[in-house]
Amino acid sequence: TGAKPKGISEIKNSPLTKAEGKRMIDELWKNSSPATFQPNENGKIYAGISSKDILQKLDIPSDLDYTDKETFLIDYIHYQKGETDFYFLRNTSPEWISRDIGFRLQNSVPEIWNPVSGEIAPVTVFEQKGKYIRLPLALPPYGSQLIAFRKGSASEQYTSAQKSGQHPPKMEFTSEGIHFLEDEDVILQKQQEETTVSNSLKSHEITGEWEVSFSDGWGAPSNETFPELISWTESENEGIRYFSGTGTYEKSFDFDLTDTENKKIYLDLGDVQKVAEVWLNGERLGISWAKPHRFDVTEIVQPGKNNLLVEVANVWSNRIKGDAVTGENFTNTNIRNTIIPSKGILADDQTRYPWKDVPLIESGLLGPVKISVVKLK
């Protein structure tokens, strides 16, 4: 594709002359225009027309299709190995999204591959519609999914999942079934049959005081009571406000454990800045560094009293700024200035600022922390 070159540059020690190059260009681009192409042994050349328009003229639809694809809300990569197609999808927004997504494939069965847990889960809601395999997919804020399509067919899957509103319900495909994550009825369709899933989402927010201890040697007190969850940077205590390191949150809470048949129970930490390691009733749940900060506690949470422990580590820059502002010397660094991070993916401003002028970065467990019971289908 592209406009016809005016000529070629002279290449040292090459038998190709400028005149010969000009003749070849004229031959390749002969009769090319937005409406025509010139066949040649290497393919077809289009001039004066965009790649998108060329694909449309050739009746080649988008590789990935969804209602508002012009917004580029979902970034993706398509890779093929043997007879298996892999799609890696990424949510570019800070909010949950759910879309009915079409993948330009035929005669394939989708699976969700989880690179964190190693789990491979079948997608039990999908349909072949024309040139696309369509399925409902939910992505967490800035989250991603790896979907593999293996050659084959499936006859027992649902063909669609619907709720009120423009987009499909927020749900997840797991090896145990579908997890419905919204408090709303969902209609599952299979050929001429409809199944209504009444999903009354039970959620218990863990509120009240938290006991927080901080790692020694970085300016914060050993222990502090937080009446509510806030960023360390909002604390009136200067040592906490400029703290960099690990803070350990401890709290007991009561939970009413009833009617758990065909349900899963999750602990959701809400917002965490930046990395958390979690224990419930002495059982290690794991580490979370990206939303959703959520753990399956179905087999661990117990009726009555439960004990929760969350270790949160933040970034180094807050303590460096604190030293620059207060004149203290908890850090040992010769870096006197830095670039202020931008919220944009591509930041043009490379200006370096003194540490005292650098804004603090939110830190700690921000919540809300919830125990949620979700329906399993």
Place the predicted regions along the sequence by residue.
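Short, hydrophobic/aromatic-enriched beta-strand segments in well-ordered soluble domains
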Residues: 146-151, 251, 307-314
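Glycine/proline-rich low-complexity spacer/linker segments in large multi-domain proteins
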Residues: 152-174, 194-206, 314-367
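Hydrophobic core residues within well-ordered beta-strands of beta-rich domains
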Residues: 206, 247-249, 265, 365
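Aromatic-lined ligand-binding clefts that engage carbohydrates, nucleic acids, or primary amines
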Residues: 102, 253-281, 308-312
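Carbohydrate-binding surfaces of carbohydrate-active enzymes
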Residues: 1-246, 254-260, 297, 370-377
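Beta-strand-rich ligand-recognition modules
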Residues: 271-273, 279-340
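Residue-level detector of short, conserved catalytic/binding motifs and their immediate flanks
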Residues: 85, 265, 276, 293, ...
